[in-house]
């Protein structure tokens, strides 16, 4: 048995019902529940078809205004995180569909110009509104309030992702715990997740993505600095 199979986020896990919960029912009952896809596979498809995901291709990871075609973009970064987290999840026996959905979603709220752009926007928000800009909160705002997809009746609705995938957006922010990254037990309102590492991620799969995020950007950023700049 793979070491983490007993805590993987599948049906039977004590957290399962919370993990797959959505803000509202996904489909009108007249159309059925589209059983050919899992809950997290639906989320993955919703994300890669939304405009916020598409815009990641125009946002560079670290260096801006580059003259080099091989500078890493956000969309490349999330795909690398998807690949790394998928490898780790499969090795440990975790739910790789969940890690993939979290991976492609985790940076959905990032500003242009990387963390420097985030800092500038935060300064403006603090000065003008007494608030701050943080890509973790902005990602939740995008998928919960701004991004729309047509349902089976042609009505535009927000993405309405599962709790476990939404949790991975603020949950990936900040460095992993150096003493070991473990998920939290509490089912918290994600709107209360207002800064990095306020809460641990809710699932082991989100912990894997948090670590994969660090693996991805540390190696790629170093490569960019040494070879492409």
Feature-to-residue mapping (PLM):
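An N-terminal structural lobe/cap that precedes and organizes the functional/catalytic core
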Residues: 2-156, 169-172, 177, 189
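Histidine/acidic-rich helix-loop-helix segments that form or flank divalent-metal centers
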Residues: 137-216, 220
